Structure formats: structure tokens, C-alpha cells
């Protein structure tokens, strides 16, 4: 058979099926991706249908309007793969277990996604379908030239020559040109009228547009929910011919009109359930806003985002950039997607958006979401946790929870949490007490089995506990009847949920939150994880409290607690450490006692070193540094000594031997204050990464968030390889 390349003419349409059939019969095509490349306006349905007939056992999926995840779901279902909840993770094994190879044909990949500007076509072609081609399954994708990967093997590209047929003749009509600028492909008549008004500056009659559609049945299809093009290729051609100024004006007008119409689209289940216009707005508003340059404003409007699907928020953001800024509903959507939180109903998705806004203290947006008209099935009462995508010391303050039980503290309903933390490399259990109504931390941590004598009168059992005594005497009694922890892989917060009054408390390694369900709503499965078949969507920036000050050395108090920060005693302070700001910080604030992330800081020394041991000069054989010393050791890092230069206050890492350029850290920071700020950022990232799902993209993203944050504090020190070496190799 011919082997088409970029230098060879296209294959005549009538010969494509035979060429693909011959290619397939050669065998050994499993886990390959091939491409059927046709011109943008070329209808591929006949070509794919004929190809399907030439390859026995092949399956065809039309990607038009589908997300990459929906396309993958349809494909696997058509191939007979079991996608039931307990089997869906095994789809990769299923593809490799077939006795013979099979071919999946995906048509209209360039029309994937619910909107015309969607990023889904690129995602489908460059990522999703490549991951699907494995084992005994090969995938052939119908693409247009702009989507054909530049590194595609020419032997797997079947370029189809355009047929010698007359193109569709369409009337020169402003109404037709305006309709092509819609984002969803099915357009309600009121929306079409607004598109015409935006393009021409003149009012348009819905009756006249209806009559126009009826007069052009070969071009337009009229149905109960609106009008669409018979040949989507014509719409794509008209869009390409539109001036950029016209595009900006039309999209801006439509965003304004849809936002103004929001009160009329209110519905307990979201805009999409309020007629054709509501469905159009829910599907297309975000992408119109992208092209109007107002997507940032949309993301700050809780009334709007409560009605926009998770995929619409992600798709619109990704169509702008591959690096999605953090602290927005779009980044929330991406982080939750990566954790496997993909609610099926808009109402539940709005509840998650409310929780994420509340988690970063964006109370204004949370309040507007709650009053958006969407009937939230549950609302977060308070949240003390590291939300998916969270990167801030404050998010880590509540700690990790292993079990919960209900108690009373001074008569008030409270939660006792069995918690765990790592101290000097060892797991340590402790107990804390939390107020159910306010979420306040009211007592603890208690690190030993005995409940402190001074608190025994404050802590009592509930009246319904069934315990023989009025109050527990030991910590172990608190959790004797606790329900077992659920599967870590199946739930975001795997501790058994605990109902207290009108709220249900959930906890786990991420922290603790209280959820108030609506009447009659069962939220036992809150936080259930169902990882999307198509995998991670894209990278997004971190989530932080909106009122958080700039990073500071004082963040170490949040991370370690004041009891693990040790100022240096005056009598222990070396005279030759003369840098004034460094002396003041060490005497007043001190250093944390830590051994974490291959770094140890020892404010009172350890078995190897004393307090601020002096290193009189830089070791011989090690590349010299501008600092003259003497140097004073505060700890160790990746085997090397961490020292402070006495005259300048610079913090340096002393390599253990020559030739350690990949671990050089000179200087680590230009001041002790900057170094301690960087330590806080590093430890925050280290602990946050530990709480992310194994093998998740968030674990890798956190490493880059940390490196970026370090460079903002000290550009030179943050760029030193030892930071990244630890993050990427441990």
C-alpha cells in the first residue's frame, strides 16, 4: 500500500478504506495511533464508514460535542470494557487481555467539546487517545491539518485528498454569519437574535430568523431547542472569515446579555434546566467570556460560576493558557478533577465551589454561591483543611486525623480527633478537641494517654454514649468505639463520617470539615473519588487564603508550634557572629528544631554538633565562596553543613566533598530571615505533597510551586539545585 507522507499527494477518498484495510492486515498495530487527515470542511463520515467496513471488529465513535472523557467512556463501552465502579480502574488490563488486535476509529476529533473554541479537540488528540492506544488496541483519529501532531510518524498518517465536489453554496447573510459565532452548536432563537444584533447593530426578529431557517433546510436545521448548521464545516468557514473586531464585539455583547438575563434563568438545578437559553448559557457563557476578555470577571461572580459545569470552567481556562492561575473557580475545578472529585449534578458541583471558596476564606464568593438560586445539597459550615491544590502553612495547621468521636467540652457539643504527626522522623499520636458549632480548636494537643487532670472536669461523654462513666479517664477510651477508617483511595477524607446535631464532620490527612446537608440529603459518600478515565486535565496554580500576608519566617510558628521554636540563649551566643539582624533574630525568634525533607536544624545542637559550632574557615578543596567567615553551623542539609557567615548573615551549605555541583547551595539565602522564610515554604510544600494522592500530578506540581515561591524570597538562593534535588528525588 502507499505510505503517505507530508511530501506525497493525498489518497483519493474512494481508496482510503482499502489503504487502511491493507495497513491493518499487516498486523502488529496494537498500541499504535494513526491519523486520517482531511481538510477542515471535508465531511469524513463516508470515509470512516467505509474504513470501518474494511476492518472487522473495529469500533467507531463520533467525538462531536463530547469531552475527551466522554469520548473515552463511549469508546471503552463500545469495545465491551466493563466500566462499573469496581472495574473501571482495570480498563488498561482489559485492553491487553484480548486475544486479537482491535481498531478504534474516532471521527470528528476536531469537533470535540461542547463549544466551537473548546480545548477538548487538542486534549483528545494529543493526550487522551494516545493513552487509550495500548495493549491490543490501536486508535485511528480523524483530524484536520491543524491538529495533526508535528512528530506523527508519516507511515501512520493517511492524508485524504479533497473530493472534486462543489462546496455548499450559502446565501450572503448576516444572520448566517452571526449564527456561526455562537459557541455551542445548538443555538436558541433568542440567542441567535442577540448574535445578529451584536454583529450588525440592528435588532433582529425571532420570527424572521425562524422563517429564514425554514427557507434554508439544506443549510440550517431547526428544532425545539434552537437552530444548528447542517454542515458544521460551513460554520467553521464563516468563523474564520470574521474580522477580529467583530468577534470581540459579538462575544462581549453576548456575555453582557447573558449575565443580565441571569435572574430569568434561575433554577434550583442550575441554568441548564431553565429552558434552551439557560442550557446555552451554562454551556457557552465561559467560552464567550474568554473571547470577550472578561473571563476573569466571570470567575469572580459566584452567581454565575454556581451554574457553570466543572468541565466548562476548565475548558475555558485551558483555551487561554496552559498555566491556569490559582485561587479561582477554574483552578478549583482542575484540582478537584485531579483528586477524582467530579460531581455528576450541577447542584453538588456548586456545593464544592462553595466549599473551596470558604476554604480560602473567600467569604464573599461563598455567600453569593449560596444565594445563587442553585439548591445546594450541602454546605460547608466550616473548613479546617488543606483543600485540593492548597499550598499554605495555614492549611496545614489543623493536622492529620486518624479517627473522630463525639464528646462534650464544658457541656458543648465537640469532636475529639485522634491525630498523627511526624516528629524527628517518628509518628506521634495526639488528641485535640474541636467545637462543632464554630470549628474552633478548644483543647489539646494531648500527647500522652492520660487526659490532663485540669481538663477532666471539662471533658465528658455524650448522654447517649452508653459509657459506664460520666467522663473518659484516658485517651484510649475516646476512640475505643470509633468506626474503622474508610479506603484512602476511595475518599478525599477517609475517616468514618460523624454526625453531630445537624452537621456531619469529615476528616482525614487533609484536615477537618463540617458539612450541613439539606433536608433529606444523604452525604455519607461525600468526597468519594472517581478518577476520570482521561486522567489529569492540566496544571493549575496553588490555592491560598485570600487574606494571607506575604510569606514570613513567622510561618514556622504555624508549622511547628511555638514549643518547637528555640531562641538562642545569650550565654550560648558566639561573639564572632556579628551580623546585627542575624543576632537579633536568633536571640528573639530562634530556630525550629526539625529533621524533615533531608534538612535538619538544631538550635541546641545534637550528638554531632554543639550550639552554633564555629567553622573557622571554608574547607580546603571545596570551591571557595566570597564570604570570609567565620561560619557557624545551624544544621545539616543533604549531608552538608548548614552555616551562617558571621559578618554578613548569609546562609550557606558546605558541600561534603569536591565535585558536588548538583547539590551546591551557595548561598542558600542572603539573610537568616529569608532562609527561615524559605524553610517554611519548603516544609509547607513537603507536607502538602505528602498528603496528595500517590502518583497524582499535584505531587509534582507542588514541587514547582515550592521552587517558584523560594525564588520569590531569594532569587539566587531559591535557584540552588539542592532544593529541587530533594523535591524531585525523595
Label the predicted regions.
Residues 41, 123-154:
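Sensor-1/coupling segment of RecA-like P-loop NTPase cores
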Amino acid at each position: 500500500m502507499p505510505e503517505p507522507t507530508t511530501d506525497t499527494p493525498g489518497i483519493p477518498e474512494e481508496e482510503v478504506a482499502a489503504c487502511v484495510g491493507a495497513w491493518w492486515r499487516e498486523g502488529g498495530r496494537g498500541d499504535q495511533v494513526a491519523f486520517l487527515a482531511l481538510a477542515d470542511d471535508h465531511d469524513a463520515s463516508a470515509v470512516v464508514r467505509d474504513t470501518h467496513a474494511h476492518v472487522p471488529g473495529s469500533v467507531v465513535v463520533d467525538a462531536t460535542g463530547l469531552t475527551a472523557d466522554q469520548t473515552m467512556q463511549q469508546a471503552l463501552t463500545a469495545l465491551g470494557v466493563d466500566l462499573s465502579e469496581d472495574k473501571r480502574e482495570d480498563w488498561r488490563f482489559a485492553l491487553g487481555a484480548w486475544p486479537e488486535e482491535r481498531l478504534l476509529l474516532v471521527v470528528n476529533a476536531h469537533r470535540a467539546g461542547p463549544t466551537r473554541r473548546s480545548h477538548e479537540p487538542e486534549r483528545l488528540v494529543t493526550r487522551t487517545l494516545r493513552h487509550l492506544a495500548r495493549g491490543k488496541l490501536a486508535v485511528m483519529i480523524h483530524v484536520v491539518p491543524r491538529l495533526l501532531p508535528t512528530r506523527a510518524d508519516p507511515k501512520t498518517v493517511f492524508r485524504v485528498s479533497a473530493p472534486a465536489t462543489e462546496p455548499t453554496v450559502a446565501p450572503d447573510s448576516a444572520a448566517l454569519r452571526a449564527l456561526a459565532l455562537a459557541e455551542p452548536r445548538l443555538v436558541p432563537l433568542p440567542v441567535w437574535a442577540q448574535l445578529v444584533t451584536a454583529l450588525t447593530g440592528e435588532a433582529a426578529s425571532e420570527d424572521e430568523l425562524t422563517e429564514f431557517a425554514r427557507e434554508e433546510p439544506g443549510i440550517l436545521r431547526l428544532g425545539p431547542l434552537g437552530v444548528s448548521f447542517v454542515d458544521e464545516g460551513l460554520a467553521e468557514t464563516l468563523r474564520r472569515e470574521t474580522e477580529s473586531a467583530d468577534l470581540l464585539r459579538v462575544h462581549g455583547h453576548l456575555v453582557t446579555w447573558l449575565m443580565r438575563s441571569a435572574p430569568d434563568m434561575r433554577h434550583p438545578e442550575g441554568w441548564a434546566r431553565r429552558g434552551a437559553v439557560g442550557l446555552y448559557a451554562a454551556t457557552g457563557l465561559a467560552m464567550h467570556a474568554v473571547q470577550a476578555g472578561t473571563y476573569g470577571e466571570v470567575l469572580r461572580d459566584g452567581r454565575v460560576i454556581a451554574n457553570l459545569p466543572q468541565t466548562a470552567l476548565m475548558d475555558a481556562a485551558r483555551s487561554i493558557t496552559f498555566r491556569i492561575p490559582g485561587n479561582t473557580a477554574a483552578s478549583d475545578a482542575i484540582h478537584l478533577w485531579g483528586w477524582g472529585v467530579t460531581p455528576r449534578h450541577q447542584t453538588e458541583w456548586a456545593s464544592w465551589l462553595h466549599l473551596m471558596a470558604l476554604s480560602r476564606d473567600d467569604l464573599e464568593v461563598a455567600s453569593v454561591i449560596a444565594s445563587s438560586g442553585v439548591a445546594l445539597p450541602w454546605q460547608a459550615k466550616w473548613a479546617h483543611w488543606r483543600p485540593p491544590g492548597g499550598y499554605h502553612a495555614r492549611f496545614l495547621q489543623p493536622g492529620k486525623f486518624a479517627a473522630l468521636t463525639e464528646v462534650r467540652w464544658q457541656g458543648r457539643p465537640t469532636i475529639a480527633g485522634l491525630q498523627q504527626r511526624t516528629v524527628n522522623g517518628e509518628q506521634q499520636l495526639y488528641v485535640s478537641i474541636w467545637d462543632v458549632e464554630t470549628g474552633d480548636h478548644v483543647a489539646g494537643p494531648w500527647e500522652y494517654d492520660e487526659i490532663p487532670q485540669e481538663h477532666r472536669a471539662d471533658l465528658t461523654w455524650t448522654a447517649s454514649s452508653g459509657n459506664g462513666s460520666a467522663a473518659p479517664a484516658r485517651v484510649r477510651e475516646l476512640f475505643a468505639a470509633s468506626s474503622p477508617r474508610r479506603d484512602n483511595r476511595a475518599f478525599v477524607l477517609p475517616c468514618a463520617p460523624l454526625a453531630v446535631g445537624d452537621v456531619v464532620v469529615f476528616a482525614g490527612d487533609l484536615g477537618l470539615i463540617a458539612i450541613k446537608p439539606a433536608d433529606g440529603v444523604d452525604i455519607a459518600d461525600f468526597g468519594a473519588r472517581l478518577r476520570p478515565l482521561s486522567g489529569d486535565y492540566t496544571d493549575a496554580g496553588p490555592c491560598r487564603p485570600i487574606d494571607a500576608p506575604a510569606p514570613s519566617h513567622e510561618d514556622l510558628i504555624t508549622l511547628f508550634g511555638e514549643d518547637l521554636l528555640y531562641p538562642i540563649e545569650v550565654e550560648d551566643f558566639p561573639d564572632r557572629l556579628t551580623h546585627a539582624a542575624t543576632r537579633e533574630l536568633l536571640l528573639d525568634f530562634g530556630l525550629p528544631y526539625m529533621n524533615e525533607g533531608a534538612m535538619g536544624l538544631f538550635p541546641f545542637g545534637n550528638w554531632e554538633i554543639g550550639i552554633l559550632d564555629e567553622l573557622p574557615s571554608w574547607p580546603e578543596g571545596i570551591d571557595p565562596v566570597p564570604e570570609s567567615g567565620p561560619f557557624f553551623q545551624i544544621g545539616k542539609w543533604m549531608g552538608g553543613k548548614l552555616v551562617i557567615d558571621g559578618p554578613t548573615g548569609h546562609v550557606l551549605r558546605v558541600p561534603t566533598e569536591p565535585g558536588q555541583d548538583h547539590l551546591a547551595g551557595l548561598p542558600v539565602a542572603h539573610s537568616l530571615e529569608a532562609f527561615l522564610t524559605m524553610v517554611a515554604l519548603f516544609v509547607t510544600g513537603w507536607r502538602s505533597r505528602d498528603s496528595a494522592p500517590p502518583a497524582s500530578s499535584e505531587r509534582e506540581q507542588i514541587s514547582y510551586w515550592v521552587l517558584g515561591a523560594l525564588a520569590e524570597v531569594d532569587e539566587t538562593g531559591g535557584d540552588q539545585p539542592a532544593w529541587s534535588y530533594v523535591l524531585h528525588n525523595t
